[in-house]
Design a protein with these regions (language model features):
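Positively charged n-region of N-terminal signal peptides that target proteins for export
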Residues: 1-4, 18-19
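Hydrophobic pocket/interface hotspot
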Residues: 59, 70-72, 79, 91, ...
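Short, cysteine-centered beta-strand-loop-beta hairpins and adjacent loop/turn segments enriched
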Residues: 88, 138-147
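C-terminal motif of bacterial Sec signal peptides marking the signal peptidase cleavage site
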Residues: 13-16
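Short beta-strand edge/turn micro-motifs at domain boundaries
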Residues: 23, 147-174
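Surface-exposed, charged secondary-structure patches
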Residues: 99-142
Length: 174
């Protein structure tokens, strides 16, 4: 009888110590989309690092507070900005100059609606980290408050913002 109890006890201990496959996590991430570079190849996009979201939130907050030092510290030296009017802002210093003039003449305020982090490794093995976000921008134009919707595609390289594409749509008259 003692032997049977010992065998049953050892079986229970053995079963309870066995790892089940259900607790294993998936080691290969699922793609969430594709990047299609100029050569028309397709590169899978994956959910990105949430630290890029935090950095983007800091960047937007600095814009709302007109904190040019923080903005400059987050910009890559080789920063490029593509605003909706077709201009190109080439370099962090040019970006700060652009903002300095804008902030002197106006008080733009951004309100974030959504942020999506994604990333992919390009054909050269370089990690590209992006945040796509939507903001409502309220500004004063000709003494009238105007709100437009912005979508930003923001490229992060080594913890800095290297490039921003800004797309704009007028607020719907609903």
């Amino acid at each position: 009888m003692k032997k049977i109890l010992v065998v049953i006890l050892m079986t229970i201990v053995s079963i309870s110590c066995t790892n089940s496959n259900e607790s294993e996590t998936q080691s290969t991430p699922n793609p969430i989309g594709v990047e299609i570079p100029n050569d028309s190849t397709r590169i899978s996009l994956y959910g990105g690092d949430m630290n890029t979201i935090k950095l983007w939130e800091t960047y937007i907050k600095a814009h709302n507070e007109k904190d040019l030092k923080t903005i400059e510290s987050i910009n890559d030296d080789a920063f490029k900005g593509y605003p909706p009017n077709g201009d190109v802002i080439d370099g962090s210093k040019a970006h700060i100059g652009f903002l300095e003039e804008w902030f002197t003449n106006s008080s733009p305020m951004w309100r974030t609606k959504y942020m999506i982090a994604n990333e992919f490794t390009d054909n050269k093995g370089v990690l590209n980290q992006w945040v796509t976000s939507g903001q409502d921008l309220t500004d004063t134009v000709d003494n009238e408050e105007v709100t437009v919707h912005h979508v930003h595609d923001v490229l992060f390289v080594n913890g800095k913002i290297k490039m921003i594409y800004v797309y704009e749509r007028a607020k719907a008259n609903e």
